[in-house]
Amino acid sequence: MLQLSFITLITLAVTSLAQPATLRLNFTPASGKFNDATKQYQSIWDAEGRRMVEAMEQVSGLKFQETDVRAIVYEGVSDSGFADRPMRLRASYPEGVKKATLVHELGHRLNIQVRRRPKELDEHRVLFLYLYDVWTKLYGKEFAGEMVEVEKKRKGIYDYESAWQWALSLSEAERAAKFKEVVKMNLSGRK
């Protein structure tokens, strides 16, 4: 019996070492007035973060390289940050848009691995090759469609509307194939 327990412990230890590193998001309010929004982002992440990461990795075929990401909750334009620069997330979004925004901004961080791309594909067009499909996998087509409409209404910083129209003019299979081409460009460039 003791030998069986020892073997079980060794198996569990080896299994946990073989698991991929968990992506942790550390949410901080920019000021006290964003405490509630910060708690909501944290609650979403605690409940759904693992599923989000799994869906993003499965659909994109990429794996997150980071293990810890700082996220500041404030009232301004959401931004993925980069390396040591924290992610910044808008406080006033409703819960559904907060979920979509987390996936969107994490997608930019995931895409750091695919810097080489055809000239006609900017960073959002690359992201949109799989973002809709991740949202669909996580929350269904209705949610994904609603979030596309939310993003299409954003004006000034980027032309989300034409980027989404372009991405969704392709079938799911065409988007996936195009994204694989981008990934392949980056793999062939590694030594």
Q: Which residues make up each language-model segment?
A:
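Bacterial N-terminal signal peptides
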Residues: 5-16
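Active-site recognition of the HExxH zinc-binding catalytic motif
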Residues: 100-113
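Short pre-active-site segment immediately N-terminal to the catalytic Zn-binding motif
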Residues: 85-102, 118
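Boundary at the C-terminal end of the N-terminal hydrophobic targeting segment
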Residues: 18-20
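Post-HExxH zinc-binding segment in Zn-dependent metallohydrolases
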Residues: 114-163
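Pan-zinc metallopeptidase signature
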Residues: 152-191
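Extracytoplasmic/secreted proteins, especially bacterial periplasmic and envelope-associated proteins
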Residues: 51, 55, 97, 101, ...
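Auxiliary, metal-adjacent structural segments of Zn-dependent hydrolase domains
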Residues: 25-85, 138-140
